[in-house]
Amino acid sequence: EMGAILAEIRDLGFDREGYLVHEPTRRRIDVVYERVDEDILYAELPELIDCHVEGKVHVLFAPNSEVVDDKGVEVFVPEMIRTYLGEEPLIKNAQTWSLAVPEERRYVMERFGELVVKSRGGYGGKDVMIGPEESRESIERFRRVVERNPTEYVAQELIDFSTHVLCEAREGSVVFRDSYADYRVIALAPDPKDPNVVEIVPGPLTRVAVPGKHVVNISSGGKMKDTWVLEN
C-alpha cells in the first residue's frame, strides 16, 4: 500500500548520477528506513554517505544517530537539556543510575537485587536483569557479569507501568488476563512547509509482556496487539 521496496543491502546500488537505486527494478530510492546495523550498511555501501550529504537520498536514521540509543546517554539527557537549550525538561526520566559514575555504581551494587540493571548496548530485552523477578542465583550471576565491565551498564527503579486486558482462546474457551503493556505513540508531520503541524495516529503500537513479566520485547517472548483510541 505504501509503495515501499523491501530490500537487502545487496539489492542496492548507484546510478551514473550518484543516486541510490534498487538494482532489480532500477528505481531510484528517495528515503531509506534502515533496519540493520549502520556499521554494516555503510561498510557495504560506502558511497551512501556522499549520496546522503549531497541530498540525493534521505536516511531515516542518519549516521551516528545511534548515540541517542545508548542507555548510558539517557542518564545525562536532563542536564543536556538544561545546558544546551537553557530549558527544564518537560518530561521526567525514569530514575536512572550510570555504573560509569563511581558513587552511583556503589549505590546500585548495594541495592542490586531491587533494581532493573541493563546493558547500555542491549536491545530486544536481552542482557537485562529485573531484580524483583529473578532468583537469588540469577541475581548473583548477573552481578558477576556486571562487575567485570560495570561502565557498560545502567540501572533503574522497577516501574510498575500500565497493564492491558488480553483475550486469549484456550481449548475452546476464552481467557482474559492482565499483562504489562508498552504503548508507542505514532506522530506524523504531514505538512513539509510547517513542521509545527503534528497529527497523532489514534492507535499506538502496543507490545505486551508474558504474564507476570515486565519485558515486552518481541524477541523475549512479548506479543503485539491492536489498541485504538475511540475518544479524546
Protein language model annotation of sequence segments:
Residues E1-N232:
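Domain-scale recognition of functional cores that engage charged ligands
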